[in-house]
Amino acid sequence: TGISSFQAIALSLAGRVGTGNIVGVSTAIFIGGPGAVFWMWVTAFLGASSAFIESTLGQIFKREEKGEYRGGPAYYIEYGIKGRLGKIYGLVFAIVTVISVGLLLPGVQSNAIASSMNNAFQIPNWIVAVTIAVILGLIIFGGVKWIANVATAVVPFMAILYILMAVFIIIINIQAVPALFGLIFKSAFGMQAAFGGIFGAMIEIGVKRGLYSNEAGQGTGPHAASAAEVSHPAKQGLVQSFSVYVDTLFVCTATALIILISGTYNTTNGDLKPGGIPELIKDNGIYVQNADGTKDYSGTAMYAQAGIDKALQGGSYHFDPAFSGIGSYFIAIALFFFAFTTILAY
């Protein structure tokens, strides 16, 4: 027996909605300007097609093992291509997936959780790491159905709460919305002088961050899709396509609006804490140089945090590298849920 279609989309969304929805979007705007948001939208429409194909194939070539459905790219590559080539290609994909999903990608997500919790609540990184490992272990040992049940409970809650924050910020800044969308489209095609020189980089960054966020075509989504029990394979393909739209068009756009409406992405011309010096990309990462000369390497999530603070405080707001305000707490909690459920999906 398999999991339900709703559990499959919740599990898939758990994998798609992660640090890329906050840090990735912030980085895209930081490097490519507002126009990068448009190219993330374009990527979502193209990526939905990839998600449909890979998830449908996962359903077609899935296998029942020990009472549960198993499938994914390694399965449909081996059984779809057939012969020695299919076995070799499927094995290579499986090995690469184990390395990336088992070792590399969880490190990105857990590091984001640890950094945000340390910034907001001053919790030592090792305590966060141990907590994540313990909770994760308890859930994983329950099997795929337990993982799906947790994802079903957490994913809708975290996505809706995050989007509601964005909606609230839009409402209190409603007069800026028309100009904001105009800015996105104008800068997307290099029609604004400020962003004309980075037209190519804008597209590249928008596409990269869009794919990093929604994972369409990466081969990570079909595993959850294959575990679902549906009447027709294409139904699960359509459901997974919808999850790409939710990830990029809703959650990523929520982050983009939080940042763009408040204007905190353009720190070279924005309000700064006295003595604070914003820096662009350096060889050793993105950082903000504080008034005392220290450097904060927390990354571009700072712009999402500052976006919430400025939207709530209005004209009295000043960019604060120390992240004092509700923004740091909200983003830390959001990153915890986003990143933790992504690790769970892996």
PLM segments and residue spans:
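Extracellular loop-to-transmembrane helix junctions
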Residues: F30-E68, D247-T248, C252-A254, F323
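Membrane-interface loop-to-helix entry segments
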Residues: F93, N111-M117, P124-I172, A176-V177, ...
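Membrane-interface alpha-helices at helix entry/exit sites of multi-pass transporters
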Residues: G2-I3, G33-W41, Y76-Y79, G83-V92, ...
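Hydrophobic, small-residue-rich membrane helices and short re-entrant helix-turn-helix hairpins
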Residues: P73, I113, I139-P156, A176-F181, ...
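Helix-loop junctions at the membrane interface of multi-pass solute transporters
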Residues: R16, V25-G32, G58-E64, G210-P233, ...
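Transmembrane alpha-helical segments of multi-pass small-molecule transport proteins
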Residues: W41, Y89-V96, N119-V144, L161, ...
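Low-complexity, proline/glycine-enriched hydrophobic segments characteristic of transmembrane helices
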Residues: Y265-I326
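Membrane-interface "cap" regions at the ends of multi-pass membrane proteins
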Residues: T1-I22, K66, V230-S231
